Regions:
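A short alpha-helical cap/connector motif
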Residues: 4-5, 13-156, 161-226
Length: 226
């Protein structure tokens, strides 16, 4: 495990955001809060093995491996506990987030609208060992996001691009000071993502940068403490 999470130079901007910031519901459809939690060393081995074995087999709008590692590192560095994911797909990014949450004492709330992808994700959560750290919803995020009370200190959005801006508008008041709102496909998402990025970069409550990662890009917007 010692070599898995080296910090490449590409992470420097994200680290800078955290340095700058230091200066300044609806019940889940699926949850296993009572499941026995694996010891950290055992869980690390189980998740790492699962992610490595499945590294080249993810389909259906899952993030690339490199971007999953970025999510993991952001949650660990920020010590985030109240995590929301919009767009589970079959669970690759969720597993990275939940693995990090297992170390920060947190939990991931994730939303998926497609039943087949949702069902596959649940099985992947069990196989990887992170199911106890996930509340998974089979729901339309357009409606559910508005209903969730928060607060959240980390949000990852990887869903319908034409709704990126609305998701942020709905969630911005529910993000804790010092928390981060991240969105995938920041470099390849088309006009809808450009509109979202223009809006969030102009929001004085947040400081935003783009992490290239796999090349698809991830926007990282951290809320400035008042």
């Amino acid at each position: 495990m010692t070599g898995l999470f080296r910090e490449p130079a590409a992470y420097s901007i994200a680290v800078l955001i955290f340095s700058l910031l230091s200066l300044s519901t609806i019940g889940p459809v699926y949850s296993e809060p009572s499941a026995p939690l694996a010891k950290p060393s055992h869980l690390d081995a189980q998740v790492s093995r699962f992610l490595n074995d499945a590294r080249h087999s993810w389909r259906g709008w899952n993030v690339p491996y490199k971007d999953g590692k970025i999510l993991y590192d952001l949650v660990i560095k920020g010590k985030f506990k109240h995590i929301l994911e919009i767009g589970t797909s079959t669970g690759h990014s969720t597993i990275w987030l939940a693995w990090a949450a297992s170390k920060t004492g947190g939990k991931v709330t994730t939303i998926e609208i497609d039943r087949d992808r949702y069902t596959t994700a649940l099985e992947n959560f069990r196989k990887s060992g992170v199911a106890p750290y996930i509340d998974a919803h089979l729901a339309d995020a357009h409606d559910l996001v508005r209903s969730l009370k928060g607060p959240f200190d980390f949000v990852f959005c990887d869903a319908d691009k034409n709704w990126y801006l609305q998701y942020f508008i709905d969630l911005a008041p529910k993000i804790s000071d010092g928390g981060c709102y991240t969105a995938h496909n920041a470099l390849q998402g088309g006009r809808d993502v450009e509109v979202f990025l223009d809006y969030i970069k102009g929001d004085a409550r947040f400081r935003t940068t783009i992490e290239r990662g796999s090349g698809e890009g991830m926007s990282i917007s951290c809320k400035i403490a008042e």
